[in-house]
Curated annotation (Swiss-Prot):
Subunit record text: Part of the 30S ribosomal subunit. Forms a bridge to the 50S subunit in the 70S ribosome, contacting the 23S rRNA.
Keywords: Ribonucleoprotein, Ribosomal protein, RNA-binding, rRNA-binding
InterPro entries: Ribosomal_uS15, Ribosomal_uS15_bac-type, uS15_NS1_RNA-bd_sf
Lineage: Bacteria, Pseudomonadati, Pseudomonadota, Gammaproteobacteria, Pasteurellales
Function: One of the primary rRNA binding proteins, it binds directly to 16S rRNA where it helps nucleate assembly of the platform of the 30S subunit by binding and bridging several RNA helices of the 16S rRNA. Forms an intersubunit bridge (bridge B4) with the 23S rRNA of the 50S subunit in the ribosome.
Listed GO biological process terms: translation
GO CC, any one term: cytosolic small ribosomal subunit
Family classification: Belongs to the universal ribosomal protein uS15 family.
Protein name as catalogued: Small ribosomal subunit protein uS15
Gene3D superfamilies in the record: 6.10.250.3130, S15/NS1, RNA-binding
Keyword Mitochondrion: no
Family matches, as Pfam families: Ribosomal_S15
Gene: rpsO
GO molecular function annotation: rRNA binding; structural constituent of ribosome
């Protein structure tokens, strides 16, 4: 259910400052968004997977906290990443 190494590398290359930038808030938010989108398609098929749904809610919460941090520290990057990922904020 997780992303492949190639998918993660592509996300890091797109949102990171360089190829090894995996810790920046932008990259973490983009990776969480990709995982959340992947899990949403999983739950369309497996409606009773409550344990997995709990993990999804945890990811959403972690992404929300990272977005709040980014908004507090760098509003321009926050606005950019919201637009690039198509989030509703």
């Amino acid at each position: 259910m997780s992303l492949s190494v190639e998918q993660k590398a592509a996300i890091v290359a797109e949102f990171g400052r360089d190829a090894k930038d995996t810790g920046s808030s932008e990259v973490q938010i983009a990776l969480l968004t990709a995982q959340i989108n992947h899990l949403q398609s999983h739950f369309a098929e497996h409606k009773k997977d409550h344990h997995g749904r709990r993990g999804l809610l945890r990811m959403v919460s972690r992404r929300r906290k990272l977005l709040d941090y980014l908004k507090r520290t760098d509003l321009a990057k926050y606005s950019e990443i919201i637009a690039r990922l198509g989030l509703r904020r």
